[in-house]
Each structure stands twice: as C-alpha cells, then as structure tokens.
Amino acid sequence: MANRTVKDANSVHGTNPQYLVEKIIRTRIYESKYWKEECFGLTAELVVDKAMELKFVGGVYGGNVKPTPFLCLTLKMLQIQPEKDIIVEFIKNEDFKYVRLLGAMYMRLTGTSVDCYKYLEPLYNDYRKIKSQNRNGEFELMHVDEFIDELLHAERMCDIILPRLQKRQVLEEAELLDPRISALEEDLDEVETSEEEDDEDEKPERMQSPEPHRRSYRDMDRPRRSPSPRYRRSRSPRRRSRSPKRRSPSPRRERDRDRHRSKSPRRHRSRSRERRHRSKSPGHHRSHRHRSHSKSPESRSKKSHKRSRRGNE
C-alpha cells in the first residue's frame, strides 16, 4: 500500500515515524486529493520539486478538516524517511524559504535535542516574510524566525504535537552545546567598538580646548550680600542712562513753588545779607540784645515832636 512506511525505516522516539501525526489528521491526509495526486510514488529526490512549489505553511483548515500541502509533504517525508544529509541541505537552502521550513519541521519531529538546537537556531537570522493558513482558511503574515521560535518552544505546530526537547541550559552544562551567540550581540559589539573609537578621537580635541575659568571655593561657599539701602554706591553713568526717568512734577506743585518765590524776593535777599554780616561780626549777640531792649534816639525825637504838636493844638 502507498500509506505504509518503508521497510528499512528506523523508529523515531520509539515508534513508527508516521505515528507522530495524530490518527484523525493522518486519515484526513490519506483521503485528501493532494495526497492521492501529488504525493503518490514520491522519493527523497522528488520531494524537493514538490517543496519548491509550496506557497504557504499550515496544518488543517475548514469545517471538513482539510490538510494543507505543507502538512501532506511533512507526512510523506516521515513515511519515506530521507537521510539526514538531505534534511540538512533543506535547512541550509536560502533560495526557497518553504523548502527550508519543511526541512526544519522534519528535523524538529525526528531529530535529537542537540540536532534541533544546532540546525534550527541559525535560522533566527532569517527575517523573510511567509504566509501561514489558520484554521478558518485565512492567511496570516509571519516571519521565518517566528516559525522557528515556535518550533523550539511551542507544544503544537501545524496541528502536530511536537516531541519534548531538553532545555538548552542542561545541554550547555553537560557540554553538549556551546553557548548561543546571537547576531544582535555581534551588532552591539560592533556599535560599541565604533563608539570607543569615536571617543578616542574626541579626547585630543578636548585636551586642546582651554578650560573655562573656575571660581575659588570662597566665591562658591560665600553667599553674596546685597548692598544695604543706606550705604549704596552712586550709580555709574551707564546705569543712570538705563534707570527709568523721574516723574515730572505735577502742575499743582509748580504753582505752589512759583507763589512762594514771587511773594518776597527782596526780603529773602536782605535777610540772607544780614545773616552773613552778623555771622562775621564778633559782637553780634550783644548788639542784637541791645537793639531789642533799648530804643534808638530817632524814635525818641519823633515821639517828642508828636507830643509838642498835640500841645499846640
């Protein structure tokens, strides 16, 4: 029969390789049109041609649970069990991304934990877009690195239960695997080296540029005192020019000043002269007292003249 596994096939994980796919899905694949027409009589060499014709990945879809061509070819490879070198060439093929994914799927189902990490982790650097068909028959956009990440960490992929994998940390401690080096780490190292070179180029420029004047610790620690209003210094001519102009006196004040000046200008002058004369003369205080208490002879003669006139009348 066409659905039997080849005679010289080895058991995988202690069972028939075709039994890695669930029985319900396996029977749906056997009944599908693609399996009967395209997968009949395929060998390891002819599978490559069919893999190059793939346009999307996926498991089963629709209400009738129809399998995708990707799932049919996966079961066919489990049936014929190609050699490991052929699968490695599938994975290393960079021209056809769906051929690469088909080889990665087969390696994940049949390979050991060490082989899965060794051959699938380099595909993390493949960021090409792929189409994936979901259960409703709708297409979704994915990337190759996303598909590989799900293969290594998910429990189910393309409606197939994936075998258990040992943790990478355990394999590293057993020295079966080397620590993984990410492509991002290499890019970061290149960026750091370029930044260090730029810093070294900038250092001589900084040494040549003069340093700005620094204040002494006294200037920094001592708080600045604002000048007291009582002993302020006179403003410089620049500050005077910048200071706001004084307000012009009101017209009422000007009138009061004019009245005060116009009252007795001669009187003010005579008083100022008398004060200067008194300050110069030594007997100023005595003469002032004498004048205030004693009457002058002229005033006496005037009074006697008035009395004589009254007597004659």
Curated annotation (Swiss-Prot):
Lineage of the organism: Eukaryota, Metazoa, Chordata, Craniata, Vertebrata
Family listed: Belongs to the PRP38 family.
Entry-linked Pfam families: PRP38, PRP38_assoc
InterPro entries in the cross-refs: PRP38 (IPR005037), PRP38_C (IPR024767)
Signal peptide range: none
Keyword Nucleus among record annotations: yes
Location of region: Disordered: 182-313
Main location: nucleus
Subunit structure: Component of the spliceosome B complex.
Any GO BP annotation: mRNA splicing, via spliceosome
Acidic residues: compositionally biased ranges: 184-202
Subcellular location: Nucleus
Coiled-coil segments: 172-201
Comp. bias intervals (Basic and acidic residues): 203-224
Domain of life: Eukaryota
Chain positions covered by the region annotation N-terminal protein interaction domain: 1-179
Biased composition regions of type Basic residues, renumbered to the chain: 225-250, 260-294, 302-313
Keywords: Coiled coil, mRNA processing, mRNA splicing, Nucleus, Spliceosome
Protein name, UniProt field: Pre-mRNA-splicing factor 38A
GO CC term (a single one): precatalytic spliceosome
Protein task: Involved in pre-mRNA splicing as a component of the spliceosome.
